[in-house]
Regions:
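Short, hydrophobic/aliphatic alpha-helical segments
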Residues: 2-21
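Conserved phosphate/anionic-ligand binding catalytic regions in large, soluble enzymes, centered on
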Residues: 16-37, 143-161
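Amphipathic alpha-helix face/heptad-repeat signature
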Residues: 29-33, 61, 68-75, 114-124, ...
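A conserved active-site cap/scaffold subdomain adjacent to cofactor or substrate pockets
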Residues: 37-44
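Short, surface-exposed loop/turn segments at secondary-structure junctions
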Residues: 48-58, 97, 144, 172-179
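A structural-propensity feature for long, helix-poor, extended segments
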Residues: 49-87, 188, 195
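Amphipathic alpha-helical interface segments
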Residues: 79, 83-152, 156
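Preference for long, well-ordered alpha-helical segments
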Residues: 128-131, 143-202, 209
Length: 209
């Protein structure tokens, strides 16, 4: 599993000429990094003097971020597996008309799944952004910039994942499916960019001397 590799081994694998792990897996990794970093900020808040009123919120935030961390880690491999399935379908026999039809149907179905996996990454990363906003607002002020980096990583996860959704939609014949995912992707992107801007604008204003 990709998630079991060391950081260096993972990066070396990304840098090689194989198409996986690619951008979709990296988007999931961005989500995992956002989850881990926001968990750190929450843990730096719990039990600290002056943050007693935030204790319950931070405990709840940790529950969510740790769950999402595990889910993003699984999605790193899930995205690569989805790509490999599409690639495998293109290798199916296409000698007879029946084989051609079966191959085409298999490619379409595998491509749908290859679009749905990064959409799952984008959805989860958007959910993460709401938690990060709370962690940044109520968490340890000494770690507010860490929360901002987590927010940027989550936004990167969203945008990277949505690019992978859209490139797969381009080859699908099911127009209702395509329209549904395109509409959701556009909404997720707009919301993610707004959430990131709101937090960064507020924190940058506070940090100005």
């Amino acid at each position: 599993m990709l998630a079991d590799l060391t950081v260096k081994d993972f990066l070396d694998k990304v840098a090689c000429s194989d198409p996986v792990p690619g951008g979709g897996s990296i988007a999931a990794l961005d989500g995992a990094l956002a989850s881990a970093l926001s968990t750190m900020v929450a843990r730096l808040t719990v039990g600290k003097k002056g943050y007693e009123a935030s204790e319950e919120v931070m405990q709840h935030a940790q529950t969510i971020t740790l769950r999402l961390l595990d889910e993003f880690i699984a999605l790193i491999d899930k995205d690569s597996a989805a790509y490999n399935e599409v690639f495998a379908c293109f290798k199916l026999p296409k000698t007879t008309d029946e084989e051609k039809a079966a191959r085409s149907a298999a490619i379409q179905e595998a491509t749908k799944q290859a679009a749905l996996v990064p959409l799952e990454v984008a959805r989860k990363a958007l959910d993460m952004m709401s938690v990060i906003a709370d962690v940044a607002r109520l968490g340890n002020r000494n770690a507010v910039t860490d929360a901002c980096v987590a927010m940027m990583a989550a936004r990167s996860a969203v945008l990277g994942a949505l690019l992978n959704v859209r490139i797969n939609l381009g080859s699908l014949k099911d127009r209702d499916f395509v329209l549904q995912l395109q509409t959701e992707a556009d909404t997720i992107e707009q919301t993610a960019c707004r959430r990131e801007k709101e937090l960064l604008d507020a924190v940058n204003q506070d940090l100005r001397i």
